[in-house]
Amino acid sequence: MKCSWREGNKIQLLENGEQYYPAVFKAIGEAQERIILETFIWFEDDVGKQLHAALLSAAQRGVKAEVLLDGYGSPDLSDEFVNELTAAGVVFRYYDPRPRLFGMRTNVFRRMHRKIVVVDARIAFIGGLNYSAEHMSSYGPEAKQDYAVRLEGPIVEDILQFELENLPGQSAARRWWRRHHKAEENRQPGEAQVLLVWRDNEEHRDDIERHYLKMLTQARREVIIANAYFFPGYRFLHALRKAARRGVRIKLIIQGEPDMPIVRVGARLLYNYLVKGGVQVFEYRRRPLHGKVALMDDHWATVGSSNLDPLSLSLNLEANVIIHDRNFNQTLRDNLNGIIAADCQQVDESMLPKRTWWNLTKSVLAFHFLRHFPALVGWLPAHTPRLAQVDPPAQPTMETQDRVETENTGMKS
């Protein structure tokens, strides 16, 4: 499948769980025919239970609902929680689950990291939010800062078709068959141009990174990137510095209070290279940053699931949308400039690690290890990802004598 730019779409930026979850649950609540939901994490907390209730209600009124969870990101849902959905008719699958080794999850590489919802070929959502209370401000200081978009219009056809053709584990023949079953056309008023881009381990290994690099090459005035896990490759870093040196204002927002300490260590290895190359680096300090968004000049923007690190750019299954729309670009710009002003600390030369031989050696070793990490993983034996579908719970059956008595008396004693 190869997607093209689609015109005439409506786009709404959704910030954090306070905006995202009500929009998703409302769309599911209004679904009439079909729901497809993919996510990396689904926790059995307050947010997860609300999603459970919304899907259960949809299935009970006859809506076809399909769920794909990552086997690493969502390993701990209870049997009761899942069985209630499958008993109602929800198709529930895990992407490449693996047994634990000494209580530890071992399937950390090549994960299904996408976050997509499609409802009735009419509405779609794509972004960085999982289904957990961690994305709500009520979670406290560790609540995550994140973004997604709600989409209406022809782009929804492409997202639905992508879902039908790219369910992990489908054979090539089945994907070919799917191409002859196109999504229904859905025309909605709107002006935004949108392109769906994704990363897989087959034909689209570097599509998302290529669009970022193209954007940096074409930028003329300003680029703002906010990304939770920032550790891209040489080409990306060189493109950032090259854009800055030709006069483009580059603002990079990264985690100042990361959920994993190694994230901050990795990003700080790049500070000397970026800051001295003219890139403005901002550490977001209010809470952990989980967003994956960017904008360029006054019309280009992207929102999705892809981080700018080795896992997302080289191993995981990811999905973003590229957006050409001045209004959306301005909305995202206002939001990002707002958090820069209120919640970020700019990295200046006084904050850069001292250039001692020891620090330089550590930086070089760590940088090359992290950057070549995907290639090292590539030496591991490859396998076809396995989809594990959860069967509905078996219905209890009455023993023969009980059945006879019930038929004779109309009741079971």
Task: Name these PLM-found stretches.
Residues 1-413:
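Charged, low-complexity intrinsically disordered terminal segments
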